[in-house]
């Protein structure tokens, strides 16, 4: 997969090169890495460490998975962009915010066709959802560690998508035109 399409091993390139079924497998595996590190590994480490806040340990474990995915030693430190793994991490930390961010991403793809833009918009919307969802759901406010993480995450996503941003500026970014269900059809 690294020799075709964009050369990235992430779900978007797998979709473009191999189709939706292999891309779904990649997305599930990437998401599982983030979810597992937060939901399963972090509590194990929390019991063995002196850090008094499980949320901090969860974020550290999850972000370690994201960094391992993004800068994998198995591919010369050139991995994916981290969106799927961050999504799995968010699913474990704050499932309702995950669903809202996913909705932002899907709507962005439907209206623009740009997956990179969807990833950026979803990440930028996260701190807003982390802040406004608890009162609507009748739950406690998000812990400070999660709020800080949600404010920093968009910078990471923008960093990993810097080449896509340049392609967007140059009008060279690939679109998923089939996903753009509201676009005008070309008439021949």
What are the language-model segments listed below?
Residues 16-42, 75:
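Multi-pass membrane catalytic core of lipid/isoprenoid biosynthesis enzymes
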Residues 68-78, 104-112, 162-166:
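C-terminal ends of transmembrane helices
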Residues 24, 55-63, 87, 96-103, ...:
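Hydrophobic alpha-helical transmembrane segments
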Residues 1-23, 166-188:
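Cytosolic, membrane-interface loops and tails of multi-pass inner-membrane proteins
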Residues 13-20, 41-45, 82-112, 124-134:
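Interfacial segments of multi-pass membrane proteins
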Residues 39-60, 91-98, 132-148:
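Helix-coil boundary and interhelical linker segments in multi-pass alpha-helical membrane proteins
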Residues 1-11, 74-87, 114-123:
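Short, non-helical or kinked segments that cap or interrupt transmembrane helices
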């Amino acid at each position: 997969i690294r020799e075709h399409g964009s050369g990235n091993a992430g779900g978007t390139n797998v979709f473009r090169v191999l189709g939706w079924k292999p891309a779904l497998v990649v997305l599930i595996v990437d998401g599982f890495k983030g979810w597992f590190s937060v939901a399963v590994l972090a509590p194990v480490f929390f019991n063995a460490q002196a850090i008094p806040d499980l949320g901090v340990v969860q974020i550290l474990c999850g972000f370690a998975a994201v960094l391992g995915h993004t800068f994998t030693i198995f591919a010369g430190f050139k991995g994916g962009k981290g969106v799927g793994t961050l999504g799995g991490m968010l699913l474990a930390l704050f499932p309702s915010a995950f669903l809202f961010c996913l909705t932002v991403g899907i709507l962005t793809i439907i209206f623009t066709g740009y997956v990179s833009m969807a990833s950026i918009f979803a990440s930028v919307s996260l701190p807003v959802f982390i802040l406004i969802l608890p009162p609507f759901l009748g739950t406690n406010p998000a812990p400070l560690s999660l709020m800080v993480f949600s404010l920093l995450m968009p910078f990471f996503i923008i960093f990993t998508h810097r080449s896509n941003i340049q392609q967007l500026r140059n009008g060279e970014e690939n679109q998923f035109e089939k996903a753009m269900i509201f676009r005008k059809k070309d008439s021949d």
